[in-house]
């Protein structure tokens, strides 16, 4: 009787232990399957931080970035070709003849690092719109300059706006234009806008200077830059919203190495001054 009871207990316990072993084996197999899954399947589930723009809107964004680069360089071409007329009109001394051109490149080169850092923190669209708006204002101010000191100062301020525009435009194209040929075309068009604008500035600046004067060339560039600013308001992708409790000003104070930026900018200013 005791043997029969022991056999009964043995047969009833055996399936339980077998099912536990099979359960642990299946869990191990599932874990191994997850570990052996391709990386593409894992990364495909990760959310994208920036949305890719539709083709039509991406084209407008690229045109806006290219246009801002074009008209900034256009003004440099106008300055070069119209410099004798500008000198006679504004009474620019011989010792300051190079400064309407050099002041622009001096400030543009020295402020690029700072502008890129600010764009990363404050948002590319916000920084781009600020730069494009003040670019139009300072281009117009160059056309309205009454003496040599004013046009040099306005050209220097225009260089700062170009430094603000460039890294933000690059960031927008990098993050929101489809990777591959569309993005490559965006960078190519933006880079091509600089020499193309300078060439057009030389040609059209000479035509303006010989006919109606050099000032209207800046008026045309200012109106076009203002139009590109308005285009940017409607077409540039929205910046990511900051997390709760994080203001833009606080992030600017904490996330940017202001001492490093100041030292780097000072070095670039001195280098540009020597080369100028």
Each PLM stretch: what is its role?
Residues 57-103, 111, 165-166, 170:
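Extracytoplasmic
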Residues 260, 265-276:
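Phenylalanine-glycine-rich, low-complexity intrinsically disordered regions
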């Amino acid at each position: 009787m005791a043997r029969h009871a022991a056999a009964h207990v043995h047969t009833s316990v055996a399936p339980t232990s077998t099912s536990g072993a099979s359960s642990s084996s299946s869990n191990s197999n599932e874990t191994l399957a997850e570990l052996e899954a391709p990386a593409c399947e894992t990364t495909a589930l990760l959310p994208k931080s920036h949305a890719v723009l539709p083709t039509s809107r991406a084209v407008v964004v690229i045109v806006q970035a290219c246009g801002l680069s074009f008209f900034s360089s256009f003004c440099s071409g106008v300055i070069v070709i119209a410099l004798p007329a500008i000198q006679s009109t504004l009474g620019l001394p011989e010792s300051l003849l190079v400064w309407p051109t050099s002041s622009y490149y001096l400030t543009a080169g020295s402020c690029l690092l700072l502008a890129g850092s600010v764009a990363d923190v404050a948002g590319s669209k916000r920084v781009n719109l600020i730069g494009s708006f003040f670019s139009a204002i300072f281009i117009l101010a160059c056309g309205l300059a009454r003496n040599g000191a004013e046009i040099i100062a306005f050209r220097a301020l225009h260089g700062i706006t170009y430094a603000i525009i460039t890294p933000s435009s690059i960031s927008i194209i990098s993050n929101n234009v489809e990777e591959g040929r569309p993005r490559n075309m965006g960078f190519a068009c933006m880079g091509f806008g600089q020499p193309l604008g300078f060439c057009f500035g030389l040609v059209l600046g000479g035509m303006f200077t010989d006919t109606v004067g050099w000032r209207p060339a800046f008026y045309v560039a200012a109106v076009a830059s203002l139009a590109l600013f308005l285009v940017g308001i409607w077409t540039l992708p929205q910046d990511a919203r900051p997390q709760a409790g994080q203001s833009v000003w606080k992030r600017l104070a904490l996330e940017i190495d202001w001492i490093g930026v100041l030292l780097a900018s000072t070095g670039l200013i001195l280098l540009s001054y020597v080369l100028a």
